[in-house]
Design a protein with these regions (language model features):
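Class I (Rossmann-like) S-adenosyl-L-methionine-dependent methyltransferase catalytic domain
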Residues: 1-102, 119-126, 130, 140-222
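Conserved acidic residues
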Residues: 108
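A conserved beta-strand element that flanks and buttresses the S-adenosyl-L-methionine
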Residues: 111
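Short catalytic micro-motifs in class I SAM-dependent methyltransferases
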Residues: 114-115
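Short, conserved loop/helix-junction motifs that constitute active-site signature segments
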Residues: 133
Length: 222
């Protein structure tokens, strides 16, 4: 696999980044969207999984999780830190995700946490097409967009959320929720937009139940 331009600067800093990534919890990072994620057990794909913090947390909740990470050093750290988590690690990268698309599996939830900003705007259409192909009917796509100055030595793009929302709509993905939050690492100049989309369900097919919907159904009703 050709080294993606967006991974520049990550391999050599993998150990330091692991400390940073693992210093915040899955619950903190996903608090704006988490209640709308599918209830377990669901099939989950974490793209740009980094050190596997989110993938391992979701696996611990009972989901079947695939973690895709193109940077070998980060992937190795993740496999070490979260050994025994049950996460299946693969090597693949945006914008086209050729291995995952060719595999043919479809997912109830696809995550792109702090990933989208590494793609140039002209890569977004092919990336969104690949993501849509990986979603099961009624599957959900959770995506965060970074706003703020680009660090030296990194390939990032500071873009508004609206073009991504419009692009998702063009691919049949409906916006379910949008939220803005401060940076969890205390960088005052950085903030984030969290977006959750849903692919249309097949006619007559059961909808994917979210955590909040599952919680509304008491144990005696299940």
């Amino acid at each position: 696999m050709t080294t993606p331009a967006g991974t520049a600067g990550y391999g050599e800093a993998a150990e330091q980044l692991a400390v940073q990534y693992e210093s915040v919890s899955f619950a903190e990072v996903h608090r704006e969207l988490y209640d709308r994620y599918p209830a377990p057990p669901a099939s989950v794909l974490d793209i740009g999984a980094g050190t596997g913090r989110d993938a391992a947390a979701l696996a611990a909740l009972g989901h079947r999780v695939v973690a895709a990470e193109p940077t070998p050093e980060l992937r190795a750290v993740g496999q070490r830190l979260h050994a025994g988590s049950g996460v299946r690690w693969v090597t693949d990268a945006l914008p086209d995700l050729p291995s995952l698309v060719a595999d043919g599996e479809r997912y109830d939830l696809v995550l792109l946490t702090a990933v989208w900003m590494h793609l140039a705007p002209d890569e977004h259409p092919s990336a969104m097409a690949a993501l849509t192909r990986l979603l099961a009917p009624a599957g959900r796509l959770a995506l965060t967009i970074r706003h703020g100055p680009v660090p030296a030595g990194r390939r990032m793009f500071d873009l508004p959320a609206e073009p991504t929302i419009a692009l998702a709509a063009d691919h049949g993905l409906r916006l379910l929720h949008r939220a803005t939050r401060a940076d969890l690492h205390g960088r005052d100049e950085v903030h984030w937009t969290a977006l959750l989309f849903e692919r249309e369900a097949l006619s007559g097919a059961p909808a994917v139940r979210s955590r909040s919907e599952a919680a509304d159904i008491g144990p005696s009703s299940r």
